[in-house]
Amino acid sequence: MPIYCHYNQIVATIVTFNPQFEILEKNILAIYSQVSNIIIVDNGSANIRLFQQQLKTYTKLYWILNTENIGIAAALNQAVLYADSIKAEWLLTLDQDSVVPDNLIRTYQQYIEDDSIGLLCCPIFDRNVGLLSKSPIVEETEEVEECITSASMLRISAWHKVGGFFEDLFIDGVDIDFCYLIRKHGFRILRINSIQLLHELGHSQAITILGKKLFLFHHPPIRCYYMTRNTLYLGIRHKCFCHFALITIKRSFLMVGFESDKLKKLLAIFYGIRDALLLRKLGKAPNLKIFKSKSR
């Protein structure tokens, strides 16, 4: 018989940036009864004060309103610090457009008494392309090397040991970096395969090349910049450059070869390579004309 964590020891956070109200409320409703508190960390959205007023009947919500976009890593660190201040032991991290199953926390609770686990996660079911997995899912649980932030639940004591999320990345690769740190400090990442997160990564699309299924995400050029820069930098930071360089080459081939805005994305990739390898420049993206488009 599993020993369940006390209800007040698990809280959730949703990091927002110009969210759509209906989707955000649906996300809140999906997790509302499963946790004791929900921390909304907003990164300078123009509409957030209105949303805060519209959601005032949800008494479990705690708002952290940043005046500008400080990046996903800094926002997550704010959430963990607040969760820690109210004596929570675990924090569920969510994107603004992800809808969790109603048994997510109940399922995760079966595994949190294992002190070796620093992160719990579940498979991702993309609305457009289906299940995102590098290999067939067979076992009920599986130890994995990495997972995305959304629907992962972190042990707050593990967050303290690794030093938190790396804020210089700003966005993209923040979750991968944290996973590397978690494992370096001796914690395990356990994926629970009996549940799934309904999610949407960009404007995802599946294609087949030489019999192999590959995914396009149609991110805007600024995200291509962050993905390129941060992926290469992580290779340097974690001393496995060849691995991350191959990921960058494959991703760049797909973005430039099969997506729209090819020239802008090619330039974004170039600037990402420059800033990662030559300038070693992180933080917020430079103010370039190719980035003057709507982005998440």
Model region roles, listed by residue range:
Residues 13-33:
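Short, well-formed alpha-helical segments that are part of the catalytic scaffolds
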Residues 42-51, 68, 98-99:
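A conserved acidic beta->alpha catalytic loop
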Residues 67-83:
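Glycine-rich, basic loop-to-helix element that forms the pyrophosphate-binding segment
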Residues 88-97:
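Short beta-strand-to-loop acidic/aromatic patch adjacent to the donor-nucleotide binding site
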Residues 102-134:
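Conserved donor NDP-sugar-binding/catalytic core segment of glycosyltransferases
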Residues 138-154:
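A recurrent flexible, glycine/aromatic-enriched loop bordering the glycosyltransferase active site
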Residues 158, 162-163, 168-201:
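A short, conserved alpha-helix in the catalytic core of glycosyltransferases
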Residues 236-296:
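Non-catalytic, C-terminal membrane-associated alpha-helical segments of glycosyltransferases
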